């Protein structure tokens, strides 16, 4: 970023992977030429983050040490220190309108009850995306009715003729004020749409500056509302970063992949969100095009309701 230090966007300058250039003497012309470079940079710093965890430079729950790593340091600067995470924050009360549920492949002789859908340490033998083996966090599909069934089936890797059980959940009455991080806020947006909003602001400021310059008889060199610019730029950065993360990091794993290694940085991010007072994470499914998931750090935040659905996969 080349701009007056007073208006320089704090977090973009070093290592973020988001490259915005070309603020001119009027302070408002943007060039969004770095998305491809940003994708590579974010993916690179994420891999370095994973490598540091695999080498034992810090453990997944040592957030103070993890923040010294480039990826989380930059992320924390944007999302925490500069309040960008506000754009990712939703309350449980805001997502109660969506259907939530959990599915499982049933044995032929099983007679499932609600307990079958509650996570229990002794049955969690492998790492999940945001939690190590043995950790009783509640993973649910969230969205419209048809979508959560499709997502749950995909997450369970069902095969034709499998017996499948599905149970709806409901958020606890005392959970409505809890906040969760929504990592999917930009999934439906294009980079062009994101960039257009910031560029439109820049063009409007140029017009205002030219108009004022004509009246005053000289060019205004610092005609930016710093707080307004900071807020707008932070929002753009959060949405762009979220989209890049979603596209470049949330990738499906193969059976041969080491889950403990591949999921370690996600598990660190979960601990980071916990340190900021969050109760869960909404994230996109890597195996279902229509589905989203939510992981709740306290499994009592939601409870089973209604009749258990029991059917064959066709």
Residue ranges: model-predicted function:
Residues 1-131, 154, 158-314:
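Active-site and NAD+-binding cores of ADP-ribose-processing enzymes
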Residues 132-141:
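A short, exposed loop/beta-hairpin motif centered on an aromatic-Gly-Thr core
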Residues 141-145, 263:
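Conserved structured core elements
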Residues 144-158:
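Short active-site loop/helix that positions an aromatic residue
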